[in-house]
């Protein structure tokens, strides 16, 4: 193993000199021993500078590190523990436990940098993945083994939907989940950990965190750490895995910080020039193979609610379904605040979902679109000036809008309402009854924050 010396430290970047002819490869992990307190720091080779020097990105804080510290080339990429021993555990980017529950024993070790599966190995079948959330299952259904984006600005409920999906998958599908927290609030990570413990779903989940307080190197690589764990469950244990990433935008942001530290010329809006290829290298590995599937749900922060920003715009093409959260809908008090007209799915197709589901979904969207078109007229002239047909459309649209809300299990403590998992046939039946006019005489308020259409009747009875 080649041994070098640290020559320069600038924030999270390190320049290390190695003996001639012993330069480490790019992406190799370098172990640096701090001579003062003997602590170990891992850095990753990012570029060769010439003169036998490499520039590395540190994956933990460089505070207190001194020049001339010894650096050892591990001759391999960052490698982490994978498999069953990681279930129920909380790890950092290097696969080290940060839950104070002792070391991870008897786990296989796997490098985080790998090639994506070849086209021959991939499996592309369109099967709906039932989430139990009405608005998602009806209007932007998720594909088993697909990639889903949760788009939304700050504070519209992305993380809550992610937590609800983890809950529903663990209780109704029984599969393994990997949760990857990239550059989000440490408090949210702690809340998630405690909630999972309480609800008893921790034993089916591995958690990997590289939060806001971590250096950019850790935030940039923690996505690959989580993905490597999910790939092991798929390929070696033949499981159907769920990979949750919160937030994929922070992965891009960390890449942008690293790019600036390495002195690369920024591209549009100050992002890194390698934006598309960085996202591609992560997304291409999230796929279904003949062994099993990885279904990924990625929360995507949209800077200043601008969907044309290069970061969300370069993530869009990789997705099978996009669930867009809207501030206007959140302001109406409708949660989950999913925008039914801007959310889309590749499998919203009669050949995949069946004719009934497709027709009901399209009718719901048609009614809501007409209601949206009439908003200006209603605001200026009032609802009484509309034709009878349009008045009926508006009253149905309002019922649909309220019925798209749903109490969540993970939000029980805030709402005081018991969570609901609504099966797909019940969802279709409920919305079909509304668009066909069977519910026109039921008061609007009865549709708010309920599960199935049967609950609407019960609530209407109580309101009398």
UniProtKB/Swiss-Prot annotation:
InterPro entries: AAA+_ATPase, ATP-synt_VA_C, ATP_synth_F1_bsu, ATPase_a/bsu_AS, ATPase_alpha/beta_chains, ATPase_F1/V1/A1_a/bsu_N, ATPase_F1/V1/A1_a/bsu_N_sf, ATPase_F1/V1/A1_a/bsu_nucl-bd. It is a peripheral membrane protein. One of its GO terms (molecular function) is ATP binding. It is an enzyme of class 7 (translocase). GO terms for cellular component: plasma membrane; proton-transporting ATP synthase complex. SMART domains: AAA. It catalyses: ATP + H2O + 4 H(+)(in) = ADP + phosphate + 5 H(+)(out). ATP binds at residues 152-159. Keywords: ATP synthesis, ATP-binding, Cell membrane, CF(1), Hydrogen ion transport, Ion transport, Membrane, Nucleotide-binding, Translocase, Transport. Produces ATP from ADP in the presence of a proton gradient across the membrane. The catalytic sites are hosted primarily by the beta subunits. Belongs to the ATPase alpha/beta chains family. PANTHER family: ATP SYNTHASE (PTHR15184), ATP SYNTHASE SUBUNIT BETA, MITOCHONDRIAL (PTHR15184:SF71). This is ATP synthase subunit beta. It comes from Protochlamydia amoebophila (strain UWE25).
């Amino acid at each position: 193993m080649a041994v070098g010396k640290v020559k320069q430290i600038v924030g999270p970047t390190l320049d290390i000199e190695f003996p001639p002819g012993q330069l480490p490869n790019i992406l190799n992990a370098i172990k640096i021993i701090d001579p003062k307190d003997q602590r170990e720091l891992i850095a990753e080779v990012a570029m060769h500078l010439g003169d036998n020097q490499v520039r590395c990105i540190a994956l933990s804080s460089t505070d207190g590190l001194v020049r001339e510290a010894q650096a050892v080339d591990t001759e391999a990429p960052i490698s982490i523990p994978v498999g069953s021993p990681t279930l129920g555990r909380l790890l950092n980017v290097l696969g080290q436990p940060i839950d104070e529950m002792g070391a991870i024993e008897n786990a296989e070790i796997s490098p985080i940098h790998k090639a994506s599966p070849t086209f021959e190995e991939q499996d592309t079948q369109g099967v709906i993945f039932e989430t139990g959330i009405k608005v998602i299952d009806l209007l932007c259904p998720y594909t088993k083994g697909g990639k889903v984006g949760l788009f939304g600005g700050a504070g519209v409920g992305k993380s809550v939907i992610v937590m609800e999906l983890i809950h529903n998958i663990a209780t109704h599908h029984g599969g393994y989940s990997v949760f990857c927290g990239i550059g989000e609030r440490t408090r949210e990570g702690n809340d998630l950990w405690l909630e999972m413990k309480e609800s008893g779903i921790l034993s089916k989940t591995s958690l990997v965190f590289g939060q806001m307080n971590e250096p950019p190197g850790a935030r940039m690589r923690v996505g690959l750490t989580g993905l490597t764990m999910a790939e092991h469950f798929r390929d070696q244990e033949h499981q159907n895995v769920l990979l949750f990433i919160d937030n994929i935008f922070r992965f891009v942001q960390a890449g942008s910080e690293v790019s600036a530290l390495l002195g690369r010329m920024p591209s549009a809006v100050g992002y890194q020039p390698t934006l598309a290829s960085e996202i591609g290298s992560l997304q291409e590995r999230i796929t279904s193979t003949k062994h099993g599937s990885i279904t990924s749900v990625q929360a995507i922060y949209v800077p200043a609610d601008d969907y044309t920003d290069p970061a969300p715009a370069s993530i869009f093409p990789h997705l099978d379904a996009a669930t867009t959260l809207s501030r206007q809908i959140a302001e109406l008090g409708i949660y989950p605040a999913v925008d039914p007209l801007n959310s889309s799915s590749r499998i919203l197709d009669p050949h995949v979902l069946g004719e009934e589901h497709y027709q009901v979904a399209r009718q719901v969207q048609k009614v809501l679109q007409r209601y949206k078109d009439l908003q200006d007229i209603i605001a200026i002239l009032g609802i009484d000036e509309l034709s009878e047909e349009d008045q009926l459309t508006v009253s149905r649209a309002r019922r649909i809008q309220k019925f798209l809300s749903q109490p969540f299990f993970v939000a029980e403590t805030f709402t005081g309402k018991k969570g609901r998992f609504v099966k797909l046939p019940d969802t279709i039946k409920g919305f079909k009854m509304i668009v066909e006019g069977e519910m026109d005489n039921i008061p609007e308020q009865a549709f708010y924050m309920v599960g199935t259409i049967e609950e609407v009747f019960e609530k209407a009875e109580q309101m009398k």
